[in-house]
Amino acid sequence: DEQYAYGAGQNAQRAVVEVNQQLYHGHPDVVDADLADYFGTIPHAELIKSVARRTVDRRVLHLITMWLECSVEETDKQGRKTRTTAAKDKRCGIPQGSPISPLLSNLYMRRFILGWKKLGLDRRLGSQIVTYADDLVILCRRGKAEEALYWMRTLMESIKLTVNEDKTRVCKVPEGEFDF
């Protein structure tokens, strides 16, 4: 399993253990990736398609659609509370802190993971993806991280997510270090 956030028995410690095991078992090249405003940029139309594939009851799908479009109360830097419809207006983003947000964020990240596997990149690059919420690393066989970075960018673009290039990098362990 690649996703370690929000699932039963999953947590940050298990993600770190998996990363260490992959490093130890021949995956020393790492793509340490950061997505720009992941929760705030998940496109509603594509997310609803993912939900629809897994939902038999159309009423549930309708409720999730309505929830994505409702206004959200936010606190500004001065501590004032305001209501915003930015997600509805932009047709993207899920509010953090809502009970259903973790499920939806994992579901959308799954699109990337399935795309990676469908292209056979897990086998071709000898790679293993480990995610925790919006944190993402791809552990590869030596010499494969640059290609993994290329494909990660390509797949993220195809699912309408933006890679934060300032925070995304290739790291070769043990020479380099990364935080997960």
Question: Could you tell me what each predicted segment is?
Answer:
Residues F180:
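Active-site and adjacent loop segments of nucleotide-processing enzymes
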Residues E2-E177:
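Conserved polymerase palm-domain catalytic core
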